[in-house]
């Protein structure tokens, strides 16, 4: 039963009081597991020393021990001091709930790697990937898929660079790195997809260079060799069976030929996933059969495993189970039809793959072991280089992202670097990983730091513009104009103006204005949706003046003008509509309107309204 930190420390102090001394080994044994920080341990040792309990490398002799006991016995406040030690340590433990500190503490427990350690881990990653690659080579669908893709390249329906990145020379003195792949990667599927998108963007820029770097004649020769070996292997398996020594030899040769191809990660991952999907189909049917027999018919699981294993697609195991004349045997008749359907689906999988279910499982098992080996090695490489991420992330603080977010993005870049690292090139991993970490952090800042998101390519243009603008400021002693910036950057002036407009940072409406900080920026921004006080007062005065002027006309004339011009009404009216209202012709309404307007144009009346006309 584990002791809590308080009881462990009490035991340590009590033991020290009884002995008069403590050894470093005893302190280490009795310290709570939470306390791993060297500063905390030193503080505890110092407090124990202050209590009169000496902390030594080894147990002292009898004379020294007697002196130590005398010293300890004279300390009447030992118990109180022990309580102080406990309270200070417990408060220190309580303060370690900060995520950054906890992350740093856990990270500090992993030792840094030497160059030899990096090479050792990189080789283990390669071993795991090689094991996966050998497993894929035994999967007939993988070879046929690769040959089909090459036929598309020959028909100019696809690019060779989308299929392979090159070939491994089997005659080279040192074994070359296997296919670059995401096998065993610590990255999430979303990050892997982003990585592939970036690779595709880069690939579109220099696709011609990539295709030229792969010799088409060599590719034709290698694919012809793969096709020929595949045909020989397939015919041998068909004639003698997969378990025959000759067939195993041909499978090994096919695997060696397949390993010479350095596939694009996307293609290799597709082959691995297709095998995994096939295995999932097998498992689904097997689980269904087991559920029908064990859960529904109450067949003992031990009996089911004994009969089913090795006879997955045969009906003999099911017939044997029925023939056992057990209480559950009769119930198997009820599920016979469903079991037959599942067995038929398993036989269909065997026809599709050209492998038995047992062989599919064996290939998938070896592939999973290789993946696990690569994953463990990649995890070790990542954990040993977490300090590198923090050292780089520190330089990018106060740029819009929290420190933990910077670390997280840097870790994603680190994991990408682990996936792509090739130790044979001679440089240390940290040299290579620094670029990936820095790129991941800068991209995340560009993508997430701004309130209004700006595309990454535009961020790069803004940074370039700011850099050139600072240079020109130093040269000319003043801010450069957009025309001067356009000339220096070889860009159209209107684009420079757009970039300058985009580069402006949004500002808070709550930004205080003035020394008293009582007013905010939002108080000084005009609300265009509301009417200005001056316009409102002018409109009200015009309404009052219009009413006064109309009051000088007859009631009939005033109403005609009100209806014709929509004064104090929702809308204006036509002559026809006004005529119907007064039960007269439209011509009579026009005459009344003309007469009323002539009266209004008289200086005694028009002078009041003329002041409202705009200059």
Swiss-Prot record:
Region (Sigma-70 factor domain-2): 381-451
A Gene Ontology term for the protein's cellular component: cytoplasm
Comp. bias (Acidic residues): 188-214
Subcellular location: Cytoplasm
Motif (Interaction with polymerase core subunit RpoC): 405-408
Any single biological process term in GO: DNA-templated transcription initiation
DNA-binding residue intervals: 575-594
Region (Disordered): 177-215
GO molecular-function term, one example from the UniProt record: DNA binding
Major subcellular location class: cytoplasm
Region (Sigma-70 factor domain-4): 549-602
Pfam families on file: Sigma70_ner, Sigma70_r1_1, Sigma70_r1_2, Sigma70_r2, Sigma70_r3, Sigma70_r4
Record keywords, A-Z: Cytoplasm, DNA-binding, Sigma factor, Transcription, Transcription regulation
Stretches for region Sigma-70 factor domain-3: 460-536
Described purpose of this protein according to its UniProt entry: Sigma factors are initiation factors that promote the attachment of RNA polymerase to specific initiation sites and are then released. This sigma factor is the primary sigma factor during exponential growth.
Similarity annotation: Belongs to the sigma-70 factor family. RpoD/SigA subfamily.
Subunit (UniProt): Interacts transiently with the RNA polymerase catalytic core.
UniProt cross-references to HAMAP family, sorted A to Z: Sigma70_RpoD_SigA
NCBIfam families hit by this protein: PRK05658.1 (NF004208), RpoD_Cterm (TIGR02393), sigma70-ECF (TIGR02937)
Name of the protein in its database record: RNA polymerase sigma factor RpoD
Organism classification: Bacteria, Pseudomonadati, Pseudomonadota, Gammaproteobacteria, Enterobacterales
């Amino acid at each position: 039963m584990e002791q809590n930190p308080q009881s462990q420390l009490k035991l340590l102090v009590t033991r020290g009081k009884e002995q008069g001394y403590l050894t470093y080994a005893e302190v280490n044994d009795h310290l709570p597991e939470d306390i791993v920080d060297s500063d905390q341990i030193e503080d505890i040792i110092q407090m124990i020393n202050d209590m009169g309990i000496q902390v030594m490398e080894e147990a002292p002799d009898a004379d020294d021990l007697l002196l130590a006991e005398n010293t300890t016995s004279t300390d009447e406040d030992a118990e109180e001091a022990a309580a102080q030690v406990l309270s200070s340590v417990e408060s220190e433990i309580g303060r370690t709930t900060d995520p950054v500190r906890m992350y740093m503490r856990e990270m500090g427990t992993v030792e840094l790697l030497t160059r030899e350690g990096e090479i050792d881990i990189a080789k283990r990653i390669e071993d795991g990937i090689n094991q996966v690659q050998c497993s894929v080579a035994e999967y007939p669908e993988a070879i046929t898929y690769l040959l089909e893709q090459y036929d598309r390249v020959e028909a100019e329906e696809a690019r060779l660079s989308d299929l392979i990145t090159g070939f491994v020379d089997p005659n080279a003195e040192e074994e070359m790195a296997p296919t670059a792949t995401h096998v065993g990667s610590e990255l999430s599927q979303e990050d892997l997809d982003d990585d592939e998108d970036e690779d595709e963007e880069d690939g579109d820029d220099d696709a011609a260079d990539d295709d030229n770097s792969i010799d088409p004649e060599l590719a034709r020769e290698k694919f012809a060799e793969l096709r020929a070996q595949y045909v020989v292997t397939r015919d041998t398996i068909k004639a003698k069976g997969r378990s025959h020594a000759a067939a195993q030899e041909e499978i090994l040769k096919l695997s060696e030929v397949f390993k010479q191809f350095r596939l694009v990660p996307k293609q290799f991952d597709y082959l691995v996933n297709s095998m995994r999907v096939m295995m999932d189909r097998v498992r689904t049917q097997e689980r269904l059969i087991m559920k029908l027999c064990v859960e529904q018919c109450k067949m003992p699981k031990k009996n089911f495993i004994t009969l089913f294993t090795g006879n997955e697609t045969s009906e003999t195991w099911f017939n044997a189970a029925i023939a056992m004349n057990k209480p559950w045997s009769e119930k198997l008749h009820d599920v016979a039809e469903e079991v037959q359907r599942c067995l038929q689906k398993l036989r269909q999988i065997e026809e599709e793959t050209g492998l038995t279910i047992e062989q599919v499982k064996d290939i998938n098992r070896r592939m999973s072991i290789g993946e696990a080996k690569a994953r463990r090695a990649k995890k070790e490489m990542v954990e040993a280089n977490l300090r590198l991420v923090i050292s780089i992330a520190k330089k990018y603080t106060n740029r819009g992202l929290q420190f933990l977010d910077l670390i997280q993005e840097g870790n994603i870049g680190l994991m990408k670097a682990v996936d792509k690292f090739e130790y044979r090139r001679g440089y240390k991993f940290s040299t290579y990983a620094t670029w990936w970490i820095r790129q991941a952090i800068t991209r995340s800042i560009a993508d997430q730091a701004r309130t209004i998101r700006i595309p990454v390519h535009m961020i790069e243009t803004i940074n370039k513009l700011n850099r050139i603008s600072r240079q020109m400021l130093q040269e000319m002693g003043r801010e450069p104009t957009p025309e001067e910036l356009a000339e220096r950057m070889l860009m159209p002036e209107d684009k420079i103006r757009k970039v300058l407009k985009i580069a402006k940072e949004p500002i808070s409406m709550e930004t205080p204005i003035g020394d008293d900080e009582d007013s905010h920026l939002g108080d000084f921004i005009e609300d265009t949706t509301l009417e200005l006080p001056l316009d409102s007062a002018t409109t009200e005065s015009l309404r009052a003046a219009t009413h006064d002027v109309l009051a000088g006309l007859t009631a009939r004339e005033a109403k005609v003008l009100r209806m014709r011009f929509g004064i104090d009404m929702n809308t204006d009216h036509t002559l026809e509509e006004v005529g119907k209202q007064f039960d007269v012709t439209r011509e009579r309404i026009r005459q009344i309107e003309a007469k009323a307007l002539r009266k209004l144009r008289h200086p005694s009346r028009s002078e009041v309204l003329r002041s409202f006309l705009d200059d």
